[in-house]
């Protein structure tokens, strides 16, 4: 199984059962999340989390404000079509502050933490912030686009 996995689900009642399933499939570390109607960690309200670590599932509620990230109204993080979403992503990776950056930091930070590159979610968020602010995240996207034949 995978060493680590961050999985968003559409229903908060699925976070614990799916974390257990991931453990049964051999995943060692995982976070299954549902954030205020979204299948990701959110800034619009609280996020329900089931974290799998060393065979044990612990569930808790995550609030972005505990990490210094302000709450946002749902309209502030709403995406659009593919071109609009690409524009938003590029602006975040170029260092633009705002609700889109905030939600990217939370979710990237969780992935970094679950991937074992940070000791906790706060450390993962700091790592994500450093990657964006240094330009490394945008550079990685451009490199991925080149090798895949895309045009980011």
Language-model segments: residues:
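Glycine-rich anion-binding loops and their surrounding alpha/beta cores
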Residues: 1-152
């Amino acid at each position: 199984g995978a060493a680590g996995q961050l999985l968003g689900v559409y229903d908060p009642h699925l976070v614990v059962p799916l974390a257990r399933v991931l453990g049964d499939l051999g995943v060692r570390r995982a976070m299954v999340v549902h954030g205020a109607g979204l299948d990701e960690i959110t800034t619009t309200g609280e996020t329900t989390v089931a974290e799998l670590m060393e065979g044990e599932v612990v569930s808790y509620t995550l609030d972005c404000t505990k990490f210094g990230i302000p709450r946002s109204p749902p309209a502030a993080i709403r995406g659009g079509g593919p071109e609009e979403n690409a524009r938003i992503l590029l602006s975040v990776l170029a260092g633009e502050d705002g609700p889109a950056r905030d939600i990217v930091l939370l979710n990237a930070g969780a992935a970094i933490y679950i991937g074992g590159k940070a000791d906790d979610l706060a450390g993962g968020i700091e790592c994500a912030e450093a990657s964006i602010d240094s330009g490394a995240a945008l550079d990685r996207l451009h490199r991925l686009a080149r090798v895949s034949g895309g045009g980011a």
